[in-house]
Amino acid sequence: MNNMNIIIADDHPIVLFGIRKSLEQIEWVNVVGEFEDSTALINNLPKLDAHVLITDLSMPGDKYGDGITLIKYIKRHFPSLSIIVLTMNNNPAILSAVLDLDIEGIVLKQGAPTDLPKALAALQKGKKFTPESVSRLLEKISAGGYGDKRLSPKESEVLRLFAEGFLVTEIAKKLNRSIKTISSQKKSAMMKLGVENDIALLNYLSSVTLSPTDKE
């Protein structure tokens, strides 16, 4: 089996440590870089001979952003780099939008010790990886009748930040878009999800996330 060079990006040092220790148990994996913000990650990518990037969805870095914005930048400028998203965000609408970016895998942090090795093994065989836990979450969209009303990546990014507690003005600044654009994208997403106000939106985002009984 060919060796796989991997970069890890997460803004929590303890998470970086845990992932690295887990990957060190796989003899054909080499960790060639670790970064805590997107700016350092992007600045160093050209210098590293990496096959795979394992990155958190929410990560600081003013210049290149995070989440879907960062992933799209990497896909555009480093097309040969495989991407596995590691995230605490278990909202199915957002996970669906991330998968639409044609990444190689997505892993919830709750299941990372088990699912990351599986994702890398799938990559070795030229396959993509979606764990059962994520597949179950995505089924909730279809069960709720929203399967034919998929959020666009930009709408998903706005909802992700809204769910994290950011105001529309703060989201606009973070994503370098106008307040009017952010408001329009938020409204469009709400119409697709069938919710009429912010309280209903937050209730929806909460209700379709992973419940304790769903965790593996």
UniProtKB/Swiss-Prot annotation:
Component of the Rcs signaling system, which controls transcription of numerous genes. RcsB is the response regulator that binds to regulatory DNA regions. Can function both in an RcsA-dependent or RcsA-independent manner. It comes from Salmonella typhi. Interacts with RcsD and RcsA. The keyword DNA-binding applies. GO terms for molecular function: DNA binding. It holds the Pfam family GerE. The modification 4-aspartylphosphate is found at D56. It comes from the Bacteria. Residues 168-187 bind DNA. This is Transcriptional regulatory protein RcsB. Phosphorylated and activated by RcsD. Residues 5-124 form the Response regulatory domain. Belongs to the RcsB family. InterPro entries: CheY-like_superfamily (IPR011006), RcsB (IPR030864), Sig_transdc_resp-reg_C-effctor (IPR016032), Sig_transdc_resp-reg_receiver (IPR001789), Tscrpt_reg_LuxR_C (IPR000792), WalR-like (IPR039420), WH-like_DNA-bd_sf (IPR036388). SUPFAM superfamilies: C-terminal effector domain of the bipartite response regulators, CheY-like.
